């Protein structure tokens, strides 16, 4: 309050407060912004690209290809998946931004811990302003700071700056830690983004491929559709042509027919056909009808003309008929042909239509198939997923399935599953085939034995040959190893030298890099600082605007809340008012107008609320728009910052990677080629020992599994390669962007240099303008905030005032009406009282006259009346006391009225202020909107530029991606072709393996059956042994040749497999390196390209192998032909064997002997097997030798590492040399710079002196002219502005004084209200006492005794009481005085009510005037605001002009003094010149510093340009290498095509060979069948031999018997010599026997010959068999030994493989080390080249500089000649200048240090200082807010008090009404009491005054009329006995109810007491007593004596009852009666 009284605050204080509030708002806005940025949703730029691509794809598919909806849905799903991934990226970005914001908050908290000064005093405001101006503005304002205070303030600021520097150092440490954390988070974020981008790019690529395939399909379908459409169009055209031709023919036919018909009609004389047709029926004539009728007529004419026509006519008709018949037949035939053709054409059309329908159905089917294929893809993916889950159940838990699966993933999974299922199927097929082969082998074992034997012999021979060949190769390998060792030694020596040079080069390169990095960091730091400053400015502006908007919104929300509260209050008030009006409407219809007014006001309020709501909605919408713009701006800034940082990091990484990769690739290619050659040779030497088929089988099985793994890995590698290529493309794009940014930065640097040079000149002007602008902005902000505050306050006051006025107007109307009614009632009551008084006096006189005898009773009665009168006089005295209080209240009321008038005036003024402020707010809003629109336009332009650039970059990126995709597709196709070739080769290998397995199984089965067949084939082998030996030699030679050919193929395959293993290992490492480093990608790509070259070599080797295999096949064909001839021979031999089987019977014994011989041969074969085992034992040391060779290779690798170390030492030496060279260069550059600086100093000194003099003279003249003009205009404007300002100040002072008066008035109102409450209490007590006194006066009469006194004594006493002026006279009671006092009170009340109504009317008028004045005030306020703005501008211009005037005056003074001193003393002039020279030198020093900075920047730019040139060279090399690789790829494609052709030829040849082999197998089967037949024949022959042996035994027996018979015969001859007959018979018989014996002997001879022949043949066969068995045993032994050797070799092979794996691992590690070393070497070489180039450039620069120095020397000489002349003049000055220069140097140093410190503080700690100031401003804002809250609280208190006052006023009004009611009730009650008392007295006096009851009734009526003026609550008498002379108030107690005062006032309503419950009209006890008295009077008097008070009184105006006067006087009494009735 005191501050408000003091008047307006000073300008400085206002500006300081405004800056503080603004800064607090900045901080609040910043906090809000920090809070708001938590919900940032970063939309990655890839969302728009993916969506755009998806949309374009959808449009193409819909328009061109009519793509199905299912595919579009799938595409949309993919795009949604991509957008979801991008949203995940955006969420990650938002999370990181939140973390950054948390770090910022931590910074704020840490900085909040700094010391903040409490700004409690007024001096702090000035200090704050100085701080802000010192920090923010480069100069100090001349108004506020004097020259004396300036150094003190500088010292204070320096101290504060030192304190802040100490605090900032602590904060820097924390900032560094936080920055490290931020960098770590950024790196993690970058890794995550790269992974996501890689995944996204793979998906995009797969998606594009799928789209391409689908587009290709759709194009094919489209081409088919076009073709079908063309065919349909052609068919249609053909049909149309045919139809037209037929139609023409048909028309011709019809015409012909019609002509014939016409001829017939004419001849017959009948009517025409057409007339018949038209006459017969009204049918239309058509061609069909003509034909039909013509045919009918033909028939009819033929039928009708027959009997009539004559013979001549018959002949003619016959001729005509014949002709007509021919024509008719032709016509019918043509018609039928035309019909057929039409039918055919229709059929064709139908066919074409059917074709179209079929094509459409095919299209639908294709679409359905597409949908089914997509569903099938999904099902396949589910099946594959289920398969993978089933496959992985044992190993791991199933991974969660994806919601949406792209086709590439389905294809991959299906491939994987198909490969796995194919592998499983292959395994099962192998098993089945093995089973089938076993079954077939069991049947065909005999056929394969001979071939296996021959092969084994050939292999054994070839193995021996290979052993010798390998021994030779081992010797060669030893020689090569020795050569390699020598080379390694030399390489180690070179390595040592190279290492030393490399170390030296690395050190030098490190130094150069540090220098380059430092320069780059400086440039980047500067650029980042500039960007940060711009961003900070933008953020500050946005924060300011957002803070302003938030404040607006908060104010609007508060206003809305207030409006809601006021609306609720208004609603409650309206409800109360409506209730009151409802009650009033029942009585008075005139109050309807008031209700209508209230309704109108309510509608106006509702409209205003709606308008405010609309305003609030508009403000919220504006705020939302601004918030969205701010969010978008923040997102753009954050995205730009991130992109800048990422681009910088990527640029550094790319530069490094390119430098490394470009060098490493060239070296690695050469080295890898050499190493691959060396490795291939070494591996060939090692792998030539592995020449056996079983090992090949195992290896091939393993290779198949590995190939499947490799395929999977190749698929993964393809994806990885694609991702890497995508990354490379992104890196290229980033490189391009980085180059563009570098160019932009270079341009920016040039521009900045120019701007710096321009800004140095324009700095002073800019500083002054900035000061003016800052002052304007501050003033505008101060005024804006002040206006806002005033507006809010005024709006609140206005609302409260409006509400109060409305309430008061309503109440005034009510009170006016009530007063009018009360006046009418009072007038009527006064008339009635007067009449009653007259009647009463008349009746008293009559009673006095009638009762002279009753003198004593009258005395007693008079004594009673005397006492009563005394009592009433005391009460009147008390009423007179309250008159003073009432007068005081009236005076207070007058004061209040005056205050109300003042408040109304203040309200009017406030309304004016609010209107003016609203106008100002509208202007400010417009300005802000214009600024916001400008900012929006700028942001839109920036965004459009950014989008355009981004679209261009995206297009370039897309083009590059497409080119890369094309290259990738080509490479994939090539890889697929290579894989197919590999698969074919693998299939071939698998087929050969299967055949080998088959043959092996057959050999095993045959080995089992050989033992069984040995005995049977002995004879066969004897014959075939010679041929077998011959064949063995041939087969051995062929087998050796084959083994020789197979060994290199085997070695090459192993080398390929090892190469594949190496590839796998290298690719695995590449994958691991790719995750962390992108640099190794290109190296791995080149490595893969080298491996592709190796693959090409392998393919060439395979071609050579194919050639060898072809030669082998030719040899095998020749061998097969020879074998066929041999088989033919064997067949002939077998035929001869069939003939010789008979001889086998006799050859058993010889066979047994031969078996023994064969056993011996078996022993020999066992011995041969042992020899072979010894040979294998000899091979084992060769394997040991191979192991030793591996160890030697390991040693060689170690030697290579040592050589690498030597090379590093050489590199160190070279680096040292480079360091020395760089030191020399630096020294030379220092000398050169010194020379340049000296030359430039001299030049600048000369030019500066000239320019300075000219410039200063021009500036002085221009400044003088400007100052004069400005001074004139400023004075004119100042005068006008001062006048307007003074008027404004007077108005402001008036407003402030009014506000102070209003506040004082409120205080006085509060005090008066308290006083009024106290007075009300006093009045209440007084009324209570009055009632008690009246009750006492009434009750005294009961206890008076003295009826016997005379009337004379009574009169005397009466006279004495009236005359005595003593204290006794106070005890008198005069009713007339009381009536007069009451009437005065009533008149006073009426006057007050009238005044109140007048005041209300005045308030209404004032309100109307205030509403009208608002418009005027608004207009005036706008005028005032314009005037104030003009005044502010004028003041600012005045200040600037004053500054200029001051500076100009100073300059003029200095010039005047200089002129005077020049005139007076030359020395004075020299001193001034010296000062100018010192200033010039200082500026020259600054210019030198700037020039040095420019030079450094130029150097940095030159270095950057050199680096860019190097990068361009690297890129050109890379492109050349790329073209070279593309050419190589083309060559590879041609070679792969040749390989494919060769493979196809080879397959055809293989198929032909397989057919030949099958033929041979069939032939062998035939031979085997023949052998089986031979075996059967042999068995049969054996059986025949056995039978022959049995016959021979029988014959021998018969011979023995015959010999016995002969002996018996001889005995019988001796005995029976006498019997001649018997002898003759015996002789005959003997002759017969002899003949038979001869025959038998001849047969035996034949048999012997045959047997001998067979024996010989059998012997031969047995010999062959024994040889074969021996060979077989030998072969079996060999096989066993070979199996043992194979098993041993397998074990050895496993060991060797383990060693090889270890060696490969070691080799890989060594290769990685070698690669690293090679990379380092390549880097060093490139760096060395760069250093050499730089050194050459430096030498060139040095030469150019030397030339320049020479030129400068010449110029220097000329300048020296010029300066020599000036030196003579300057020698005298130099002595004085040296001291001044020293001082100036020190001052310059100090100033530079201060400037640097200030700049550092501003750059590094500006934000923190701003935060500190913001904190201080927050404190000020808190203080201001506290003041505001206090003010608001005070206003609320005032409002509450006003409300309470209004409520009290209402209560007082209610109390007045209640008092009236109470007066009426008291009158009524007093009347009843008086009636009761008088009735009692009358009953007592009936004895004496039986004839005079009217006097007592008259007296009772007078008392009743007197009592009707008073209304009081119920009273109870404490005791029945008391002293009448003592007024004991304690015994008469007023009992209040338990309700609060808010619910009733002064006893309104029913009240509960301790003794009785009474109504407002009177107590029930009195009613009871009154009724008792009435009943007594009626009983004693006979009826109506006591009821005369209710009788009518005759008067002049008519008759009127007292009960009506008591009951119908007031509205409140009617309400009370209604309550009683209810």
Curated annotation (Swiss-Prot):
Which InterPro entries does the UniProt record give? Rootletin-like_CC
As for what it does, the entry says: May be a myofibrillar protein.
Supply the alphabetized keyword list.
Answer: Coiled coil
Is Ion transport among this UniProt entry's keywords?
no
Name of this chain's protein: Major antigen
- List all Basic and acidic residues biased stretches: 1-29, 1969-1983
Q: Does the keyword Cytoplasm apply?
A: no
Q: Which domain of life is it from?
A: Eukaryota
Q: Which lineage is the organism of this entry classified under, starting from the top rank?
A: Eukaryota, Metazoa, Ecdysozoa, Nematoda, Chromadorea
């Amino acid at each position: 309050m005191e501050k408000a009284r003091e008047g307006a605050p000073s300008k400085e204080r206002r500006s300081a407060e405004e800056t503080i509030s603004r800064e607090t708002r900045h901080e609040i806005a910043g906090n809000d912004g920090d809070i708001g940025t938590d919900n940032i949703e970063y939309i990655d730029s890839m969302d728009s690209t993916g969506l755009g691509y998806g949309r374009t794809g959808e449009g193409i598919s819909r328009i061109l290809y009519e793509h199905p909806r299912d595919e579009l849905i799938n595409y949309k799903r993919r795009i949604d998946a991509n957008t979801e991934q991008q949203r995940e990226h955006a969420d990650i970005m938002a999370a990181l931004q939140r973390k950054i914001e948390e770090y910022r908050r931590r910074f704020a908290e840490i900085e909040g811990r700094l010391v903040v000064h409490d700004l409690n005093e007024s001096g702090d405001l000035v200090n704050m302003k100085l701080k802000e101006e010192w920090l923010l503005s480069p100069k100090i304002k001349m108004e506020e700071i004097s020259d004396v205070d300036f150094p003190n303030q500088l010292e204070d600021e320096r101290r504060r700056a030192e304190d802040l520097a100490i605090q900032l150092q602590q904060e820097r440490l924390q900032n560094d830690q936080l920055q490290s954390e931020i960098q770590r988070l950024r790196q993690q974020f970058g890794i995550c983004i790269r992974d996501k981008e890689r995944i996204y790019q793979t998906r995009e690529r797969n998606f594009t491929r799928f789209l391409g395939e689908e587009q290709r399909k759709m194009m094919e379908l489209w081409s088919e559709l076009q073709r079908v459409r063309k065919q349909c169009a052609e068919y249609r055209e053909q049909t149309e042509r045919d139809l037209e031709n037929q139609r023409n023919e048909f028309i011709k036919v019809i015409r012909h027919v019609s002509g014939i018909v016409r001829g017939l009609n004419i001849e017959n004389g009948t009517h025409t056909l057409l007339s018949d047709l038209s006459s017969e029926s009204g049918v239309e004539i058509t061609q069909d009808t003509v034909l039909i009728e013509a045919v009918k007529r033909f028939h009819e004419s033929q039928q009708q003309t027959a009997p009539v026509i004559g013979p001549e006519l018959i002949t003619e008709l016959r001729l005509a008929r014949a002709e007509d018949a021919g024509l008719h037949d032709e016509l019918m035939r043509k018609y039928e042909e035309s019909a057929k053709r039409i039918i055919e054409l229709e059929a064709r059309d139908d066919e074409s239509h059917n074709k179209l329908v079929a094509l459409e159905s095919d299209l639908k089917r294709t679409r359905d198939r597409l949908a089914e294929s997509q569903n099938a893809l999904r099902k396949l993916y589910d099946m594959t997923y289920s398969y993978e889950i089933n496959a992985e159940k044992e190993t791991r838990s199933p991974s969660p399935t994806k919601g949406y699966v792209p086709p590439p993933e389905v294809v991959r999974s299906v491939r994987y599953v198909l490969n796995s299922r194919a592998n499983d199927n292959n395994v099962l097929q192998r098993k089945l085939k093995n089973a089938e082969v076993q079954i077939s082998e069991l049947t065909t074992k005999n056929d394969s034995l001979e071939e296996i034997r021959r092969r084994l012999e050939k292999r054994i021979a070839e193995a021996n040959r290979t052993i010798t060949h390998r021994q030779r190769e081992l010797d060669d390998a030893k020689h090569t190893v020795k050569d390699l060792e020598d080379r390694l030694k030399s390489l180690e020596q070179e390595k040592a030298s190279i290492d030393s040079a490399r170390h030296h080069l690395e050190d030098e390169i490190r130094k150069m890099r540090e220098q380059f990095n430092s320069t780059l960091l400086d440039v980047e730091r500067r650029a980042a600082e500039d960007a940060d400053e711009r961003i900070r400015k933008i953020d500050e502006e946005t924060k300011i605007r957002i803070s302003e908007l938030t404040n607006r919104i908060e104010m609007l929300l508060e206003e809305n809340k207030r409006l809601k509260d006021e609306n609720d209050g208004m609603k409650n008030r309206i409800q109360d008012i409506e209730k009151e009006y409802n009650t009033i409407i029942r009585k008075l219809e005139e109050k309807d107008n008031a209700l209508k007014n209230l309704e109108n006001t309510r509608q106006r309020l509702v409209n205003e609320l709606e308008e405010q709501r609309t305003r609030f909605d508009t403000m919220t919408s504006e705020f939302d728009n601004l918030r969205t713009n701010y969010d978008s701006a923040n997102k753009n800034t954050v995205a730009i910052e991130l992109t800048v940082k990422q681009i910088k990091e990527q640029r550094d990484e790319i530069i490094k990677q390119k430098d490394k990769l470009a060098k490493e690739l060239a070296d690695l290619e050469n080295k890898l080629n050499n190493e691959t050659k060396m490795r291939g040779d070494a591996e060939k030497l090692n792998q030539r020992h592995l020449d056996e088929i079983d090992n090949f089988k195992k290896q091939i099985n393993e290779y198949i599994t590995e190939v499947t793994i490799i395929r999977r890995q190749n698929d993964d590698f393809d994806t990885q390669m694609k991702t890497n290529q995508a990354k490379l493309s992104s890196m290229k794009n980033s490189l391009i962007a980085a180059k563009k940014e570098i160019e932009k930065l270079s341009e920016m640097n040039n521009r900045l240099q120019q701007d710096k040079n321009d800004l140095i000149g324009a700095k002073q002007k800019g500083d002054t303008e900035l000061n003016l602008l800052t002052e304007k902005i501050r003033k505008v902000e101060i005024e804006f905030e002040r206006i806002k505050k005033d507006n809010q306050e005024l709006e609140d006051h206005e609302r409260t005032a409006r509400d109060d006025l409305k309430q008061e107007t309503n109440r005034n109307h009510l009170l006016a009406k009530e007063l009018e009614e009360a006046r009418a009632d009072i007038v009527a009551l006064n008339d009635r009282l007067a009449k009653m008084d007259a009647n009463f006096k008349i009746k008293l006189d009559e009673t006095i006259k009638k009762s002279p005898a009753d003198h004593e009773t009258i005395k007693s009665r008079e004594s009673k009346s005397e006492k009563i009168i005394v009592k009433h006089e005391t009460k009147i005295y008390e009423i007179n006391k309250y008159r003073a209080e009432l007068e005081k209240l009236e005076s207070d009321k007058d004061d209040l009225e005056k205050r109300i008038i003042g408040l109304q005036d203040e309200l009017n003024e406030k309304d004016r202020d609010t209107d003016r402020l609203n106008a100002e707010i509208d202007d400010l809003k417009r300005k802000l909107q214009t600024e916001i629109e400008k900012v929006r336009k700028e942001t839109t332009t920036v965004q459009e530029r950014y989008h355009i650039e981004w679209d261009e970059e995206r297009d370039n990126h897309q083009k590059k991606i497409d080119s890369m995709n094309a290259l990738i597709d080509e490479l994939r196709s090539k890889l697929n072709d290579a894989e197919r070739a590999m698969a074919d080769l693998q299939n071939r290998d698998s087929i050969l393996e299967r055949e080998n397995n088959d043959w092996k199984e057959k050999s095993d089965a045959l080995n089992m059956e050989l033992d069984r067949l040995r005995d049977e084939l002995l004879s066969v082998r004897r014959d075939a042994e010679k041929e077998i030996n011959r064949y063995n030699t041939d087969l051995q030679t062929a087998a050796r040749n084959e083994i020789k050919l197979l060994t290199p193929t085997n070695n090459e395959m192993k080398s390929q497999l090892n190469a594949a293993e190496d590839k796998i290992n290298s690719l695995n490492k590449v994958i691991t390196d790719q995750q962390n480093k992108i640099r190794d990608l290109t190296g791995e790509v080149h490595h893969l390209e080298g491996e592709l070259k190796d693959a090409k070599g392998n393919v060439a080797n395979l071609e050579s192998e194919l050639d060898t295999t072809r030669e082998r096949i030719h040899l095998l064909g020749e061998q097969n032909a020879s074998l066929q001839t041999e088989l033919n021979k064997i067949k002939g031999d077998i035929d001869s064997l069939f003939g010789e089987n008979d001889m086998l019977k006799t050859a058993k014994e010889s066979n047994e002997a031969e078996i023994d011989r064969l056993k011996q041969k078996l022993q020999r074969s066992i011995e041969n097997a042992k020899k072979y085992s010894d040979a294998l034992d000899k091979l084992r040391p060769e394997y040991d030798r191979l192991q030793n060779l591996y160890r030697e290779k390991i040693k060689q690798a170690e030697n290579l590492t040592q050589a690498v170390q030597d090379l590093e030492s050489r590199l160190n030496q070279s680096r040292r040399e480079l360091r020395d060279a760089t030191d020399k260069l630096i020294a030379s550059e220092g000398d050169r710079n010194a020379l340049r600086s000296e030359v430039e100093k001299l030049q600048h000194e000369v030019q500066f002196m000239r320019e300075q003099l000219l410039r200063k003279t021009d500036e002085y003249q221009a400044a003088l002219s400007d100052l004069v003009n400005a001074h004139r205009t400023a004075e004119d404007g100042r005068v006008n502005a001062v006048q307007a300002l003074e008027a404004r100040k007077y108005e402001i002072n008036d407003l402030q004084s009014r506000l102070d008066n209003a506040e004082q008035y409120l205080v006085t109102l509060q005090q008066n209200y308290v006083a009024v409450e106290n007075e009300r209490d006093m009045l209440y007590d007084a009324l209570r006492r009055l009632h008690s006194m009246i009750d006492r006066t009434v009750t005294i009469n009961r206890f008076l005794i003295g009826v016997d006194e005379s009337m004379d004594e009574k009169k005397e006493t009466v006279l004495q009481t009236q005359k005595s002026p003593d204290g006794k006279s106070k005890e008198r009671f005069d009713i007339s005085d009381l009536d007069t006092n009451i009437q005065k009170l009533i008149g006073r009340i009426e006057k007050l009510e009238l005044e109140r109504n007048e005041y209300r009317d005045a308030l209404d008028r004032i309100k109307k005037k205030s509403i009208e004045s608002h418009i005027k005030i608004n207009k005036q306020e706008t005028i005032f605001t314009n005037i104030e703005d003009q005044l502010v501008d004028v003041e600012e211009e005045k200040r600037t002009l004053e500054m200029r005037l001051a500076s100009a005056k100073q300059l003029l003074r200095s010039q005047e003094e200089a002129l005077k001193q020049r005139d007076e003393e030359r020395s004075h002039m020299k001193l001034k010149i010296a000062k100018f020279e010192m200033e010039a030198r200082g500026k020259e020093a600054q210019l030198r510093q700037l020039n040095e900075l420019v030079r450094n920047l130029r150097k940095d730019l030159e270095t950057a340009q050199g680096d860019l040139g190097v990068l361009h060279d690297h890129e050109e090399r890379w492109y050349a290498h790329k073209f070279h690789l593309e050419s190589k790829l083309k060559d590879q494609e041609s070679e792969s095509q040749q390989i494919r052709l060769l493979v196809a030829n080879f397959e055809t040849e293989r198929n032909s060979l397989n057919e030949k082999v099958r033929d041979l197998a069939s032939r062998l089967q035939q031979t085997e069948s023949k052998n089986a037949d031979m075996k059967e024949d042999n068995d049969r022959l054996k059986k025949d031999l056995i039978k022959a042996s049995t016959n021979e035994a029988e014959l021998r027996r018969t011979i023995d018997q015959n010999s016995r018979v002969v002996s018996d015969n001889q005995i019988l001859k001796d005995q029976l010599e006498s019997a001649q007959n018997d002898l003759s018979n015996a002789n005959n018989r003997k002759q017969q026997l002899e003949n038979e014996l001869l025959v038998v002997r001849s047969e035996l001879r034949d048999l012997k010959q045959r047997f001998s022949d067979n024996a010989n043949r059998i012997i031969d066969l047995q010999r062959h068999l024994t040889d074969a068995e021996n060979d077989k045993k030998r072969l079996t032994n060999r096989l066993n030994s070979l199996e043992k050797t194979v098993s041993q070799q397998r074990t050895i092979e496993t060991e060797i493989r383990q060693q090889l794996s270890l060696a490969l691992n070691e080799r890989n590690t060594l290769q990685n080390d070698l690669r690293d070393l090679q990379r380092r070497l390549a880097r060093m070489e490139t760096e060395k080249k760069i250093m050499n180039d730089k050194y050459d450039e430096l030498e060139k620069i040095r030469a150019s500089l030397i030339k320049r120095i020479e030129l400068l020397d010449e110029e220097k000489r000329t300048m020296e000649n010029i300066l020599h002349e000036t030196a003579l003049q300057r020698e005298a000055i130099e002595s004085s200048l040296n001291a001044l220069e020293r001082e100036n140097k020190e001052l310059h140093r100090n100033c530079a240090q201060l400037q640097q410190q200030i700049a550092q503080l501003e750059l590094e700690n500006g934000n923190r200082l701003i935060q500190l100031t913001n904190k201080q401003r927050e404190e000020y804002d808190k203080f201001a807010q506290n003041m505001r809250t206090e003010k608001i609280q005070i206003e609320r208190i005032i409002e509450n008090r006003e409300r309470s006052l209004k409520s009290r006023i209402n209560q007082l009004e209610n109390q007045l009404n209640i008092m009236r009611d109470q007066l009426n009730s008291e009158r009524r009650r007093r009347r009843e009491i008086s009636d009761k008392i008088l009735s009692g007295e009358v009953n007592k006096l009936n004895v004496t005054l039986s004839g005079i009851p009217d006097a007592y009734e008259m007296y009772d009526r007078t008392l009743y009329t007197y009592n009707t003026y008073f209304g009081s609550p119920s009273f109870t008498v404490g005791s029945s006995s008391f002293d009448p002379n003592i007024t004991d108030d304690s015994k008469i107690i007023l009992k209040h109810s338990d309700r609060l005062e808010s619910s009733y006032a002064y006893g309104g309503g029913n009240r509960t007491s301790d003794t009785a419950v009474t109504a407002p009209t009177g107590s029930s006890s009195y009613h009871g007593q009154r009724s008792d008295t009435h009943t007594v009077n009626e009983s004693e008097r006979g009826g109506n004596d006591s009821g005369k008070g209710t009788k009518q009184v005759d008067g002049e105006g008519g008759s009127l009852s007292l009960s009506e006067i008591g009951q119908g006087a007031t509205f409140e009494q009617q309400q009370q009666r209604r309550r009683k009735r209810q």
